[in-house]
Amino acid sequence: MAISRLIIENFRNLAAVDLEFDHGFNFLVGNNGSGKTSLLESIFYLGHGRSFKSSVSTRIITYDKPYFTLHGRIWEQQHEWSVGLQKQRKEGLTLVKINGEDGNKISDLAHLLPMQMITPEGLTLLNGGPSYRRAFLDWGLFHHRPNFHSAWSALNRLLKQRNAALQQTYDYTDLQVWDVELSKLAHQVSLWRTDYAEALRPEIEQTCRLFLPELDIQVSFHQGWDKNTDYGDLLRENFARDKHIGYTVSGPQKADFRFKANGFPVEDVLSRGQLKLLMCALRLAQGEHLMVQKNRSCIFLIDDFASELDETKRGLLAERLRQSHSQVFVTAITAEQLKQMQPENHRTFSVNNGMISL
């Protein structure tokens, strides 16, 4: 999987950009504020339909312009696709095209472009709330199980309906229609998450032994309620509590994927550098699992490669990325910070005030 060409129009300070990328490593070098992270953000947006920096997409559109447009040429296993996304300022409309055809969804783009993002802010995967770790698992299931996305969407829709109904009813029988289907979906999604977490665990632990040999990293999945309890029974038994609180307390929406180091929560005992290495290990293990199981490679996006890592650890990460045979985009302030990451096939772009050159 690789993006061979990217055309950008009106995306932050990138007014008009047309770039051809290496299928291996691509280095984006420039001072803070030069536009290198914006370029990384545009690639992420093309694959996710959202930004990793801003929750308000219309703010990404260049000032006084009506829209931004991203167009990419995608290559995978001798096949090529043309993909495009336009975000309009008026009404915030998003238009998606694949091979020139309208009517596609953002999820169609996401399926075509499996990406792993590594940023300094990405430590929330480890020291943030459980929602970040559920998203980590669900990303994998989205790419491994074709019917996961529809089941996950239906589950979230039913939870919203149930929570709204809790505000209006005093009789549990009014919720039974939702709870029968909700229980089925909850068990299915939780089973998929459990199986995926267990399949991923050996690869995570193996990568952690390489990156953090001084630590014993343990991985465990918690589905969001007692695994020995039927979820339908739990919903009925907890009706009064859920009604009092105003939302459904237990369930797959409370699941967590937890990590310990030498028996203690990693967020309590690891340094920021160790947390970053663990986060990198998780992303790499997940990408490698996709390759092994589905013969599909990820695109890795790495912002501020040198942050929190010493030269030795940067070398370890660089070598593991080279072994993955993935397309990699890396930002850095100076080329010197990338000296450990100099594979045979690479391309370096200089970024200065929204202007990009080889």
Curated annotation (Swiss-Prot):
Keywords: ATP-binding, Cytoplasm, DNA damage, DNA repair, DNA replication, DNA-binding, Nucleotide-binding, SOS response. It is found in: Cytoplasm. The RecF protein is involved in DNA metabolism; it is required for DNA replication and normal SOS inducibility. RecF binds preferentially to single-stranded, linear DNA. It also seems to bind ATP. Transmembrane segments: none annotated. One of its GO terms (biological process) is double-strand break repair. The keyword ATP-binding applies. Its main location: cytoplasm. PROSITE patterns: RECF_1, RECF_2. One of its GO terms (molecular function) is single-stranded DNA binding. ATP binds at G30, N31, N32, G33, S34, G35, K36, T37. GO terms for cellular component: cytoplasm. InterPro entries: DNA-binding_RecF, DNA-binding_RecF_CS, P-loop_NTPase, RecF/RecN/SMC_N, RecF_2. This is DNA replication and repair protein RecF.
